[in-house]
Structure formats: C-alpha cells, structure tokens
Amino acid sequence: MISVGHYLAVSAVLFTLGVLGIFINRKNIIVILMAIELILLAVNINLVAFSAALGDLVGQVFSMFVLTVAAGEAAIGLAILVIYFRGRGTIAVDDANRMKG
C-alpha cells in the first residue's frame, strides 16, 4: 500500500524540480511558468495526501481551489506572453525587464 511518505517524496521531487527550473532557466518565461505549475502541483499532492490520511475533505476542496487558480494563472500568463511576443518579437526575460510602466 502507498503511504503518505511516498506521496510526500513525489511532492518533494516535483517541488524541487520546480524551484530548480526557476533558478536555472531565467531566460525563458514559458519555462518559468511551467516550473510554477510544477510547484503548485506539488502543493496539491501534499494537500490531497494529508487530507486522505487524516480523513478530512477540507484539503481536497482546497486542492480544487488551487487547481482553479493555477488554470487561471496559466491562461492569463500565456495570454500576456502572446501579446508581448506580438509587440516585441521575443519572450526573453531580459527584454521584459526593460518594459516601461
């Protein structure tokens, strides 16, 4: 049987990959968005694992809320990237740092 420790190990690996993805690849905004999604997935796995282990549904409901927020964040982030790419022709983070505003 799979215990909570197994879920925590998978979640820790996903969280670490997400954090490393942000720190290692700072040039591509799409990769940074995918790394943030990995971090949110790791958080969701933790919420569901502890919720199932404790027999409480609050963690699972909150996990659905986090999934909804993550989907909205991804959609808005990609829409902003498409508009930025059409205007500038690149999605490099270095060029985004020079934005006016």
Curated annotation (Swiss-Prot):
UniProt KW keywords: Cell inner membrane, Cell membrane, Membrane, NAD, Quinone, Translocase, Transmembrane, Transmembrane helix, Transport, Ubiquinone
EC number: 7.1.1.-
Function statement: NDH-1 shuttles electrons from NADH, via FMN and iron-sulfur (Fe-S) centers, to quinones in the respiratory chain. The immediate electron acceptor for the enzyme in this species is believed to be ubiquinone. Couples the redox reaction to proton translocation (for every two electrons transferred, four hydrogen ions are translocated across the cytoplasmic membrane), and thus conserves the redox energy in a proton gradient.
A single MF term (Gene Ontology): NADH:ubiquinone reductase (non-electrogenic) activity
Membrane topology of the entry: Multi-pass membrane protein
A Pfam family: Oxidored_q2
Subunit: NDH-1 is composed of 14 different subunits. Subunits NuoA, H, J, K, L, M, N constitute the membrane sector of the complex.
Record-linked PANTHER family: NADH DEHYDROGENASE SUBUNIT 4L-RELATED (PTHR11434:SF21), NADH-UBIQUINONE OXIDOREDUCTASE SUBUNIT ND4L (PTHR11434)
Catalytic activity: a quinone + NADH + 5 H(+)(in) = a quinol + NAD(+) + 4 H(+)(out)
GO biological process: ATP synthesis coupled electron transport
Localization (cell): Cell inner membrane
Name of the protein described by the UniProt record: NADH-quinone oxidoreductase subunit K
Residue stretches spanning the membrane: 4-24, 29-49, 65-85
Enzyme class: translocase
Alphabetical list of InterPro entries matching this protein: NADH_UbQ_OxRdtase_chain4L/K, NUOK/Mnh_C1-like
Entry GO CC: NADH dehydrogenase complex; plasma membrane
Protein origin, superkingdom: Bacteria
Similarity annotation: Belongs to the complex I subunit 4L family.
